[in-house]
């Protein structure tokens, strides 16, 4: 076979190839079908048929052919059945779930697949991959994300879009995008909460009469990268659903992708819970301190409350201003309550210790000291009177039997006694109540009564011999000695204020006793003694009367109740002793009893001891209930 035969074979092959390329168009030229024997390799058959030929000329020819009569404004099968559009998503990352903004950010590959018969080709069996520039030349579904706040298609280094054409006209369109979608977070159990965030896909303009959206591959349309990590959250799973929604423009198919995540509580344990627990426990150190350490205990309580308030404020800055009460808010409030109770406990024992405790004890000890002072006052006064009576008795017993031997009192001595009685203020019956009987039985000596004693003036002088020995010859010395004794004994009675060794009160320093009665000075007593009857029987009866009066007055002094004794210190203790002046009514007695039971000073060490056990126990029970409820 020569050169002519080879040329003829080549022409025949070209004709056959041309007829195959123009198979869709009617041609008057008959088509020939060549059957090769089975011994011909498949590679040779593909070479002749050119089904895997996708070179530049073939692709250009295919695109020119399909796009020459393609209208991008019309959906596939326009006027006929709706176009099925399959959706699939490949998630590469979920960057952030924000509690403040109530949203999350997701980056993904979003794929849509549909069939457009206008793009079918037969020149090759290979799929054609086209770049982003075909986006303006081909029809694509108008899917959008219903809950998206912001979204963008990545354009580094070029716009991340891809088209893939199949010979039967199937189109697969994929884009790489990042969107920020709204997510309504339920923060009631924060930070032990589980959240579900949705990604909703829907057609914007085409109703179910034009487009039907559905998930690809029978529920396996969602794929996640193996390195998916969500900050502060753990990915639990995903679910996909679809439903039909109705609007006034028609019905639409809505696809829903739901992510389940759980918050990691470890960071909050370190940043919030442990500092809060340690601060609360630190506030209980005051229970082991002495209850009179006011500065230390109050400082610990206030510092603990300040730390808890700072932690709460720092936490609120990271959370939205919502009305719901979060679990962590309850925990911090309970810790604040325990710290406040520790402060309240110290206020309670501080009130018991200082108002009903040591401060109360000196006022209570004043009562027996006042009684003792009153007793001493009576003892001094009556003792001095008894001494005077004894001196008078001794003087009478030492008198001579013959009264004519006693010299008469001179007018000068009587004048001295009279001037002394005028200078010494006489005790009245109202001010000297314990000696009323004595003042009634022994009238005061006057100048006239003394002048009626012709024979006893010398005896009266001898009755004062004990008090001023060596001055019997000079009668003018007697008033001076009496005056000195008055001045010496004018300050003999003491009154106890805070201690029994302290100075007299203002009343006693002005000559009054504990009850406000005038004290009987020795000058007055001496004047009275001068006028007493020197008869033996009268002296004895007067002595017995004074002793009887002393016993009665002493008994009445010890029989005084607390209110009468406290009345003597009214000017100094009016504010503190007003509690004891409650009238004896049933309501007052109940109130006093309840107040004593509630504010008993003996509870001071017991309250701290109970608090050391009760506070940790209550706080531990609260933590058990709190964590079991929120974790399980």
Swiss-Prot record:
This is Gamma-aminobutyric acid receptor subunit theta. Residues 491-511 have a biased composition (Basic and acidic residues). One of its GO terms (cellular component) is GABA-A receptor complex. Expressed in brain. Disulfide bonds join 183-197. Residues 22-268, 316-326 are extracellular. It catalyses: chloride(in) = chloride(out). The keyword ATP-binding does not apply.
């Amino acid at each position: 076979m020569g050169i002519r035969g080879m040329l003829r074979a080549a022409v025949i092959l070209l004709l056959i190839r041309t007829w195959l390329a123009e198979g869709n168009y009617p041609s008057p030229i008959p088509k020939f079908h060549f059957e090769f024997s089975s011994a011909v390799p498949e590679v040779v058959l593909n070479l002749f048929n050119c089904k895997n030929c996708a070179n530049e000329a073939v692709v250009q020819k295919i695109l020119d052919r399909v796009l020459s009569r393609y209208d991008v404004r019309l959906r596939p099968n326009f006027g006929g059945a709706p176009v099925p559009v399959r959706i699939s998503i490949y998630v590469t990352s979920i960057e952030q779930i924000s509690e403040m903004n109530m949203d999350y950010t997701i980056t993904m590959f979003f794929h849509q697949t549909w069939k457009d018969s206008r793009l079918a080709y037969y020149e090759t069996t290979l799929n054609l991959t086209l770049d982003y520039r075909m986006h303006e030349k081909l029809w694509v579904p108008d899917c959008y994300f219903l809950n998206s706040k912001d979204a963008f298609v990545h354009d580094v280094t070029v716009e991340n879009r891809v088209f893939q054409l199949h010979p039967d006209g199937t189109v697969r369109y994929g884009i790489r995008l990042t969107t920020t979608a709204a997510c309504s977070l339920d923060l009631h159990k924060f930070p032990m909460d589980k959240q579900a965030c949705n990604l909703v896909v829907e057609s914007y303009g085409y109703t179910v009469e034009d487009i039907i959206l559905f998930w690809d591959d029978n529920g396996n349309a969602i794929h996640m990268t193996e390195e998916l990590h969500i900050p502060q959250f753990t990915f639990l799973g995903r679910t996909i659903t679809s439903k039909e929604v109705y609007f006034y423009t028609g019905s639409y198919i809505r696809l829903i992708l739901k992510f389940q995540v759980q918050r990691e509580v470890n960071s909050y344990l370190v940043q919030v819970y442990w500092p809060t627990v340690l601060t609360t426990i630190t506030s209980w150190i005051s229970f082991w301190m002495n209850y009179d350490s006011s500065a230390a205990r109050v400082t610990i309580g206030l510092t603990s409350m300040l730390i808890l308030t700072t932690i709460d404020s720092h936490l609120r800055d990271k959370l939205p201003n919502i009305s719901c009460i979060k679990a962590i808010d309850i925990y911090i409030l309970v810790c604040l309550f325990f710290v406040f109770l520790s402060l309240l406990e110290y206020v309670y024992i501080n009130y018991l210790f200082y108002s009903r405790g040591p401060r109360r004890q000196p006022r209570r000890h004043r009562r027996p000291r006042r009684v003792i002072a009153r007793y001493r006052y009576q003892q001094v006064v009556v003792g001095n009177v008894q001494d005077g009576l004894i001196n008078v008795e001794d003087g009478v017993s030492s008198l001579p039997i013959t009264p004519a031997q006693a010299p008469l009192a001179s007018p000068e001595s009587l004048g001295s006694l009279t001037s002394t009685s005028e200078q010494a203020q006489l005790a009245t019956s109202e001010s000297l109540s314990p000696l009323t009987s004595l003042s009634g039985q022994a009238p005061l000596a006057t100048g006239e009564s003394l002048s009626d004693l012709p024979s006893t003036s010398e005896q009266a002088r001898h009755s004062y011999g004990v008090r001023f020995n060596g001055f019997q010859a000079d009668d003018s010395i007697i008033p001076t000695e009496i005056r000195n004794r008055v001045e010496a004994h004018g300050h003999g009675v003491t009154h106890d204020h805070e201690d029994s060794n302290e100075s007299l009160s203002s009343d006693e320093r002005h000559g009054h006793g504990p009850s406000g009665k005038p004290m009987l000075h020795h000058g007055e007593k001496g004047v009275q003694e001068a006028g007493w009857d020197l008869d033996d029987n009268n002296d004895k009866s007067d002595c017995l009367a004074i002793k009887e009066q002393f016993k009665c007055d002493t008994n009445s002094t010890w029989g005084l109740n607390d209110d009468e004794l406290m009345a003597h210190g009214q000017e100094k203790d009016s504010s503190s002793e007003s509690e004891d002046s409650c009238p004896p009514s049933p309501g007052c007695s109940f109130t006093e009893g309840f107040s004593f039971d509630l504010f008993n000073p003996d509870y001071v060490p017991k309250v701290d001891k109970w608090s050391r056990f009760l506070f940790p126990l209550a706080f531990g029970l609260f933590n058990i209930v709190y964590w079991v409820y929120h974790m399980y």
